[in-house]
Curated annotation (Swiss-Prot):
Pfam assignment, any one: Bestrophin
Assigned protein family: Belongs to the anion channel-forming bestrophin (TC 1.A.46) family. Calcium-sensitive chloride channel subfamily.
PANTHER family associated with the record: BESTROPHIN (PTHR10736), BESTROPHIN HOMOLOG 13 (PTHR10736:SF28)
Main location: membrane
SS bond partners: none
Subunit structure: Forms oligomers.
Function: Forms chloride channels.
Membrane topology: Multi-pass membrane protein
UniProt GO molecular function: chloride channel activity
Transmembrane domains' residue ranges: 29-49, 72-92, 236-256, 272-292
Protein name: Bestrophin homolog 13
GO CC annotation: chloride channel complex; plasma membrane
Keywords annotated in UniProt: Cell membrane, Chloride, Chloride channel, Ion channel, Ion transport, Membrane, Transmembrane, Transmembrane helix, Transport
């Protein structure tokens, strides 16, 4: 599931699961090994290549020139622009896929209004429709989510979960043999057939029935959009450009960020054994790029991937609670004398009747929320003006929000 976090900055930075440390530590380790390999070559390796002092000095100067060129090359790569545009598109795409997920409360609430009878057949119909909705989700999500696929490795495994019966499984397999794309659509079509029977038997209100059909269409569209997101990924060339820019930038820093003897001797540079700024920069940019890589497939196995297993379990519980428990439970007695707000809004008069003008009740505060209510929000979009007598009056109470005298200083909006 996407990692939830709260607290101060120190606690957030020390988190491991779903953090930048877990994402980029392997790349950082490889980078530091290569960096210190180049450093050892510059400090000790050149002296071991040739015994001639002049040749070693010439080779060292050539290496220093190459390092300076690499440092200048890093300024030519617009890494911030490329990564910013790339990651912003990937994160927006990731969030749109989460928003595409359909929650069953809306369609089942309409169902309980259309099919509100309490006979056994109506109960079974509501229960079956709720099961078919979750079955369609499970069939579609197992095609796009690695976690759902691991939970239900085959369609037959849905029988053990209770979402599918053996007879329905045979129908689904027969349909799948003829058309591979019809498996997840079939339960939604069964819902339409059930509602057609309900329409013929109970004659529900046309507006409510049309609303249910509209919610079912939105449900179908959400699954189709998820398939589309899974089929059509971010263009490969876009990812390649971002990857090439990121890793080539830090390849050049392997040489360009080396402390050189001439700069150290003249005091232009300090010989920091640990390249602190380069490490921080590496974590920034590589972690930034890894965010785009990890969020490319939001239904995978990474820490920040959307947990469809939890959502499926939650939808199953909510669905059957709506069509069974909530629909069959009696309505609370609202005509009793337990409604405190009703008595506050309609206090009895002297003749025993309720007041014709209701009062607006004030909800009480606890001792913890009392201090928060002492500073209510207020409007600041008004212009005070001088009425010529030395007093300040509000613009709205005297002139409205449209006109002011031309000889007055005012703010127009």
């Amino acid at each position: 599931m996407t990692i939830s976090y709260s607290g101060n900055v120190i606690r957030i930075l020390l988190r491991w699961k779903g953090s930048i440390w877990r994402t980029a530590w392997k790349e950082l380790l490889i980078y530091l090994i290569l960096y210190y390999s180049v450093r050892v070559f510059y400090l000790k390796g050149i002296d071991l290549i040739d015994d001639d002092e002049d040749d070693r000095l010439k080779m060292r100067r050539m290496f220093e020139t190459f390092c300076r060129q690499c440092d200048s090359y890093t300024r030519l790569i617009p890494l911030t622009f490329l990564l910013g545009f790339y990651v912003s598109n990937v994160v927006a795409r990731w969030w749109r896929q989460f928003e595409t997920l359909y929650w069953p409360e809306d369609i089942l609430s309409v169902l309980c209004t259309v099919l509100h009878q309490h006979d056994e057949k109506s109960k079974r119909r509501r229960h079956t429709i709720a099961r078919y909705l979750n079955l369609a989700n499970a069939l579609a999500w197992r095609d796009i989510s690695s976690k759902i696929r691991l939970r239900f490795p085959s369609v037959h495994s849905l029988i053990e979960s209770g979402l599918l019966t053996e007879k329905e499984y045979q129908i689904l397999e027969a349909m799948h043999a003829e058309n591979e794309s019809s498996r997840w659509i079939t339960p939604l079509h069964w819902i339409q057939l059930i509602m057609r029977q309900v329409e013929e038997e109970h004659k529900p209100t046309a507006s409510l029935f049309n609303q249910f059909v509209g919610e079912l269409r939105i449900f179908r569209q959400s699954l189709r959009k998820l398939y589309s997101y899974d089929w059509v990924c971010v263009p490969l060339v876009y990812t390649q450009v971002a990857a090439l820019a990121t890793y080539s930038f830090f390849f050049f820093t392997l040489f360009g960020r080396q402390p050189l003897f001439p700069d150290i001797e003249t005091g232009k540079e300090l010989d920091l054994v640990v390249p602190v700024f380069t490490i921080v920069q590496f974590l920034f940019f590589v972690g930034w790029f890894k965010v785009g890589q990890d969020l490319m497939r939001p239904f995978g196995l990474d820490d920040d991937d959307i947990e469809l297993n939890y959502i499926l379990d939650r939808n199953v519980r909510i669905s059957f609670a709506i069509v069974n428990q909530l629909q069959e439970s009696p309505i609370p007695d609202f005509e009793s004398n337990d409604d405190k707000l009703w008595h506050e809004m309609h206090p009895p008069t002297k003749d025993g009747e309720t007041s014709p003008i209701p009062r607006i009740p004030q909800l009480p505060h606890s001792k913890y929320s009392k201090q928060l209510s002492e500073h209510p929000p207020r409007l600041h979009a008004y212009v005070p003006i001088d009425d010529g007598k030395g007093s300040i009056k509000d613009l709205e109470s005297h002139h409205g929000c449209v006109s002011l005298k031309k000889d007055k200083k005012h703010i127009s909006w």
